[in-house]
Amino acid sequence: MLNKYSIFVIIISIFLIGFSTGKNDNPYVVVLGIAQDGGAPHAACTKDCCVDRWDNPQLHHMVSSIGIVDPSTDEVWMIDATPDFSMQLNTLTMDQKRLFKGVFLTHAHIGHYTGLMHLGREVMGANQIPVYAMPKMEAFLTKNGPWSQLVELQNIDIKSLQNENSVQLNKNLSITPFLVPHRDEFSETVGYKIEGPNKSLIFIPDID
């Protein structure tokens, strides 16, 4: 687990250097989590990578996710809705001072979509939050509860994605999904290419 965390941090750090040029109004990304689906430490883990973490909250890691921020418009987007969604959303929106514009899902493993539950009436009672999903991921959400209830109650508004077709987020940002190999039991798996005015970044949370 620790090796995967280290590789993730190194890769995302390299891309961050290229994506943000340091100007206050330039788009940038925020690393919201680096752990696998269960977080770190994860349930029932007694390996060396978990033992020291149980009693030290400073060593806890949230599940892999990044946020996209455009300071010029105060708009933010999230890639993947993890089990740590509530904390990650608060970090990304700076206590709701920024406008949350939607979630881009990568695939149907528990660390990457189950945070959508917070958008339902039991928690946020959200109103048509855009959730961007590939065809199989969209079908998974619309045909299976409790996710289908989010659609029926219009807590979320699913936006259909297609492989390598770009979505224009605003005048400064676009994002493009692309298929990657992974264990696709319930949906396809994608990475995302995020393009700003001058730089671009690729985010792939899971790949075989």
Please state what every model-predicted region is.
Residues 23-92, 158-208:
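Core dinuclear metal-dependent hydrolase active-site scaffold
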Residues 98, 111, 154, 171-173:
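Structured loop/turn residues at beta-strand edges in well-structured enzyme cores
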Residues 62, 67-132:
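Active-site metal-binding motif and surrounding structural segment of the metallo-beta-lactamase
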Residues 5-15:
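Sec-dependent N-terminal signal peptides
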Residues 13-26:
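Bacterial Sec-dependent signal peptides at the C-terminal "C-region" and cleavage site
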Residues 136-145:
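A short, active-site helix/loop in glycosyltransferases that binds the activated sugar's phosphate group
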Residues 44-47, 92-95, 117-121, 145-148, ...:
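Short, glycine/charged-enriched secondary-structure capping and boundary segments
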Residues 1-2:
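N-terminal secretory signal peptides that target proteins for export/translocation
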